[in-house]
Regions:
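Outer-membrane pore/translocation modules
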Residues: 34, 99-202, 272
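Outer-membrane beta-barrel "beta-signal"
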Residues: 145-148, 152, 289-302
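Bacterial Sec-dependent N-terminal signal peptides
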Residues: 1-32, 222-224, 297-301
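Transmembrane beta-strands of outer-membrane beta-barrel pores
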Residues: 44-50, 72-74, 82-86, 106-108, ...
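Outer-envelope beta-barrel architecture signal
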Residues: 34-40, 64, 74-76, 107-111, ...
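Membrane-embedded beta-strand positions of outer-membrane beta-barrel proteins
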Residues: 40-42, 68, 76-80, 111-113, ...
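Outer-membrane beta-barrel transmembrane domain signature
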Residues: 48, 62, 181-264
Length: 302
């Protein structure tokens, strides 16, 4: 099932890459194109998923990833990352993680797609000055979703300059954002959680959000940019999902990036924060916090 979702999402993004590759007018006093036909990227992503439930914080053990990417000026992007080694922990837990994310930074539209499958979490507390871990090796969280965000002031604010380093933001600018998305979540408890969470459940959500983005041109070399959107999703567990039985779920997504740009290369430190809330059939709340940080070096090639 996970590979089918990944294949469908990949196909969807390839089609959209081709569709949005058609050039659109920009205010060249604010945004300019690079003259290069290609870029090559090397990046180090750190993808995380934290669960907040019943005053407890659940974390998996994470691997360290590295990645490479390639883009031609027609708009076709290819970014691939893979695990190189697990980060050391003293929990004696080895989490199973599939974390697939795709981000399309268009001239007017931002598209985010993700599929996450995490199995194996732990909690920790202090006891007699030492860390004590409680392991939940079969506690599983699966989720996938698709977000679309429209940039209203797209002639002066460039998503690509801020988050892809494939355009140049010449003057500071901001824009109102309008977005919507569809999301699926499934939570499978560990056997040790049967008293507090007796059975697995899934959850469907659909909603809309509004936000703002701003790029601050600190100097000709440095750019600081951020965007944040907040909204409300509506949905419920599949067994009770009906128009007359919808719940409201708060949702938020944010981005922050610091870029250093030269004529033919750049580096960026970027954070993406995608947070959702779900409820079990017994109305228990689960906060799903999914931050991603990434260090990227981009080389532009003529």
């Amino acid at each position: 099932m996970r590979y089918t979702i990944i294949q469908i999402t990949t196909f969807f993004f390839v089609i959209l890459n081709i569709t949005f590759a058609i050039a659109q007018d920009k205010d060249t006093l604010y945004v300019q194109e690079y003259p290069h036909k290609w870029w090559v990227k090397a990046f180090i992503p750190n993808k995380m998923l934290t669960i907040l439930h019943d005053k407890e914080i659940y974390n998996p053990t994470y691997p360290q990833n590295i990645g490479v990417g390639l883009r031609k000026i027609i708009g076709m992007n290819l970014l691939v990352s893979f695990s190189v080694f697990p980060l050391k922990t003293d929990t004696d837990l080895s989490s199973s993680i599939t974390d697939f994310q795709m981000h399309k930074y268009g001239k007017k539209l931002l598209l985010d797609g993700y599929y996450q499958d995490y199995r194996g979490f732990f909690t920790q507390r202090e006891q007699d000055g030492k860390k004590v871990y409680t392991l939940f090796p079969n506690f599983t969280v699966k989720r996938w979703g698709l977000d679309g965000t429209y940039v209203l002031r797209n002639k002066r604010f460039s998503l690509r300059a801020a988050f892809e380093q494939s355009e140049k933001q010449i003057k500071s600018a901001g824009s109102l954002l309008l977005g919507s998305g569809f999301y699926y979540h499934k939570i499978v408890p560990d056997a040790s959680q049967q008293q507090s969470l007796p059975k697995a459940f899934d959850n469907y959500q659909m909603g809309a959000n509004i936000g703002y983005a701003y790029s601050w041109v600190v100097s000709p070399r440095w750019l600081l940019a951020g965007m944040v959107s907040a909204g409300v999703n509506f949905g419920n567990n599949s067994e009770v999902l009906a128009w007359h039985n919808l719940r409201a779920y708060p949702a938020s997504i944010g981005r922050l990036t610091l870029n250093y740009n030269r004529e033919d290369w750049s580096f960026a430190l970027t954070g993406i924060f995608n947070n959702k809330t779900v409820y079990s059939p017994s109305a228990q709340s689960f906060e799903l916090l999914a931050p991603t940080t990434q260090f990227t070096i981009t080389r532009h090639i003529r």
